[in-house]
């Protein structure tokens, strides 16, 4: 299901609306924040999102939230696993911050993976895990 949010900090006046998607499959709950641009989630959005196993969150700034704001949103959602997205990659000409800035801000040691295969029984139970998917 989808949850309405904004692509900017001006209630959509600059970049319009964004949809947060909640995907439930095989007892795993994934939250994809899309081009989320708000500084933080509203109480209503947090309630609609609910418990999250895997959070896919933009971290590059400019068109979405930046590293510091992403850490704030992560603290609101408290997922078991984090997958950053929308950050600077080699050859990309858009002005985005690299994932290293987010990793430093978050303070977790990332696990680099080519492909993520996950089952409910393999989700972390104690500490949040940071996954960097390789391109």
Regions found by a protein language model. Give the residues of each.
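A general structural detector for well-ordered alpha-helical segments in enzyme core domains, enriched
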Residues: 19, 45-48, 69-73, 98, ...
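Proline-aspartate-enriched helix->loop->beta-strand connector
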Residues: 51-57, 61, 67-87
């Amino acid at each position: 299901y989808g949850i309405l949010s904004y692509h900017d900090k001006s209630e959509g006046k600059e970049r319009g609306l964004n949809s947060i998607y909640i995907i439930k499959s095989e007892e795993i709950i994934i939250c994809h924040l899309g081009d989320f641009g708000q500084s933080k989630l509203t109480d209503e959005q947090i309630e609609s999102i609910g418990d999250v196993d895997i959070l896919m969150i933009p971290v590059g700034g400019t068109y979405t939230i930046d590293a510091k704001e992403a850490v704030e949103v992560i603290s609101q959602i408290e997922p078991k696993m984090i997958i950053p997205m929308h950050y600077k990659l080699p050859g990309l000409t858009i002005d985005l911050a690299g994932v290293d800035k987010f990793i430093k801000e978050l303070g977790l040691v990332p696990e680099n993976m080519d492909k993520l295969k996950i089952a409910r029984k393999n989700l972390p139970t104690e500490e949040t895990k940071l996954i960097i998917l390789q391109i």
